[in-house]
Amino acid sequence: MSINATLLIQIIAFVLLIWFVNKVLWGPLSKLMEDRQKKIADGLSAAEKGKHELELAEQRAKEVLKEAKAQAQNVLSQAEKRGSEIVEDAKIKATEEADRIKAAAQAELEQEVSRAREDLRKEVSTLVVSGAEKILNKEVDAAAHNDMLETLVKSI
């Protein structure tokens, strides 16, 4: 095996080719691959972070919705309670008003009955006095007595 100049030139050319590929192509290519790998890792990290934030936001939304439902239920129950109180107050007031009107009507009726009785007593006593005067002024026989009683009954 003899080493001649061609072999030596080929070895030098091969070494220069490797140095050139390493310097010009391999360095930027490996830097480009590292940058790309870093971008992908950052993207995956951001996606994971976004997924976590989405889960937190969904959980907060559920809590807010649950709180809003509880608040709405509370407002509804208070409104129903207040409505029942208003209806009950109205019933009580209506009952009191009806009782007051009924008592006033009863009192007025009793006054009217008392007045009517008093008027009737006065009229009856006037008629009795008038009848007694007629009886005393006349001598009464049975027929005249019956006539006076009938006249008295008709005038009553």
Curated annotation (Swiss-Prot):
Lineage, broadest ranks: Bacteria, Pseudomonadati, Pseudomonadota, Gammaproteobacteria, Thiotrichales
SUPFAM superfamilies per record: F1F0 ATP synthase subunit B, membrane domain
Oligomer status and interactors: F-type ATPases have 2 components, F(1) - the catalytic core - and F(0) - the membrane proton channel. F(1) has five subunits: alpha(3), beta(3), gamma(1), delta(1), epsilon(1). F(0) has three main subunits: a(1), b(2) and c(10-14). The alpha and beta chains form an alternating ring which encloses part of the gamma chain. F(1) is attached to F(0) by a central stalk formed by the gamma and epsilon chains, while a peripheral stalk is formed by the delta and b chains.
Cell compartments where the protein resides: Cell inner membrane
InterPro entries: ATP_synth_B-like_membr_sf, ATP_synth_b/b'su_bac/chlpt, ATP_synth_F0_bsu_bac, ATP_synthase_B_chain
Domain of life according to the entry: Bacteria
Sections of the chain in a coiled coil: none
Keywords on record: ATP synthesis, Cell inner membrane, Cell membrane, CF(0), Hydrogen ion transport, Ion transport, Membrane, Transmembrane, Transmembrane helix, Transport
Family: Belongs to the ATPase B chain family.
Record-given protein name: ATP synthase subunit b
GO molecular function: proton-transporting ATP synthase activity, rotational mechanism; proton-transporting ATPase activity, rotational mechanism
